[in-house]
Amino acid sequence: MNIAFQLAVFALIATSSVLVIRGHLVFASPDGWSNNKNVVFSGTSLWIGLVFLVAILNSLIS
């Protein structure tokens, strides 16, 4: 269970980093938002899911 928790936290940190970098690139380009809207929404949905997964795993471990 510890390994699953650590992997979930790593995935959350990696997804957060990618979204921070990707967000700046999307809004900096002229047509970035209209072309990459689905990617941003998918990444945000993944991030929210990982937050809940980390919370559930944390409650099981402690």
Swiss-Prot record:
One of its GO terms (biological process) is photosystem II stabilization. It is found in: Plastid, Chloroplast thylakoid membrane. It is a multi-pass membrane protein. One of its GO terms (cellular component) is chloroplast thylakoid membrane. InterPro entries: PSII_PsbZ, PSII_PsbZ_sf. It comes from the Eukaryota. The chain crosses the membrane at residues 8-28, 41-61. Keywords: Chloroplast, Membrane, Photosynthesis, Photosystem II, Plastid, Reaction center, Thylakoid, Transmembrane, Transmembrane helix. Its main location: plastid. The keyword Protein transport does not apply. Belongs to the PsbZ family. May control the interaction of photosystem II (PSII) cores with the light-harvesting antenna, regulates electron flow through the 2 photosystem reaction centers. PSII is a light-driven water plastoquinone oxidoreductase, using light energy to abstract electrons from H(2)O, generating a proton gradient subsequently used for ATP formation. PSII is composed of 1 copy each of membrane proteins PsbA, PsbB, PsbC, PsbD, PsbE, PsbF, PsbH, PsbI, PsbJ, PsbK, PsbL, PsbM, PsbT, PsbY, PsbZ, Psb30/Ycf12, at least 3 peripheral proteins of the oxygen-evolving complex and a large number of cofactors. It forms dimeric complexes. This is Photosystem II reaction center protein Z. It comes from Zea mays (Maize).
